[in-house]
């Protein structure tokens, strides 16, 4: 690092002896702040997604206080500010609808204010990519502090995983093996503390992605939300944010193509969520890194899944932390030369390899397995292409049934999610265990927002027969806590005129994960005729933000960002407001 200290952005607010400097400093002082507290010091923004409507992030006020202490100790001045909290737990129709909105909030808050560096307080699923996208668009020094996973769920003396147990028990109710009272009894034991889902769902996956990308300190991903060490990490992150400003360590030096390759490999090792495919693409787009689905095949396929966590495995995030967390996984990969780019820089100024080469691994290789004893030998995201998904689709092998990953079945078609709900449990539905459930119009434009409805629950009559999985295909997403042989993110989506819109009841579809093929088994001429007969999707005139979303959202293979947000716009100081 250079010994020369960079010019502070905040000096263009507070460092001038003129009318503008007078006003900016004076307004800060109305909070009881003295000159020496902020004048000439790095101003560190604390970007907080706390909200009582986002239970996962309910403890962020306390975390922010510890970040502030770290900033002050390192000689900086902290300023906390709120941004849109797009938590998954309560927000309808889907938090994905507002991920880009939240990123715009973050970007404009950073650029328009006297902020030299920023600590991003993220937690629930979409908050991590949203804040990273916004910060990347500005390319300022930034460090991620996630809220951590909640405590293990407990029910009838056993551990239960948040999210995952909902899918399990709801299917058991439909199958008639438990009562609705049994189902509801588990409700109070699933979420026992603040924090994100305690499975390897999207929140934990994206926390691991942030750590693998190098944008958070080691162990950030797995420390439980209510563990005191979470506060210690927050304090250290505040200190480090000040040092990053002095070193001019911007996100563009960390979020390189090499960093994204590391994250893709890690996603395979941990059995991470398919949502990471969309989010990493969107983050990469904001910092100017080219990333596409072929990178997931090139880097991820063939990588064993060695983290034995639900929904792919047995354990929960508490056990993952006690076993050594992500640094232990990275050490295991590093010792086998499986980290693509161990020299990638991280926020603490060290490389990913340096941070993890001596990381301890605990627990007799149960939670974090050895590479020769994985839970799935080929756990990387499976990218599928074919006449049904010309721009691609994805499937998560670690959560799928191996016997179904090469399958040919007859399509049972639902034109939308409402039709699926209306028909799926109809005793007269023409479906058997070898059928393929196909759902349309659940993509970015069609839902809108690409909701997590792709893991369609199975027909009640098949559940009663003991069927536990079927091939399912849609242009939707699914929760990272879900499981099954589920083909997702079909692009182009049905609402954008993709071939998925042409599938008819009774068509035969072939899925071959080994070759990455998803094929609608009809003659090319027939498919061309169907495509020609497609009626242009009816333009939804909903107005407001949703109208903007529908008109500007990109397809899943492009990360579902807005077309006008792709690219890094930097943090050039705007003109004065007075």
Task: Provide a role label for each language-model segment.
Residues 110-131, 142-146:
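A short, small-residue-rich loop immediately preceding and capping a beta-strand
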Residues 2-52, 56-58, 63-83, 89, ...:
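Catalytic or ion-coupling anion/metal-binding cores of large enzyme and transporter domains
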Residues 54-58, 90-98, 118, 123:
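Short coil/turn segments at secondary-structure boundaries
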Residues 71, 105-109, 118:
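Glycine-rich, N-terminal phosphate-binding loop and its surrounding beta-alpha-beta segment
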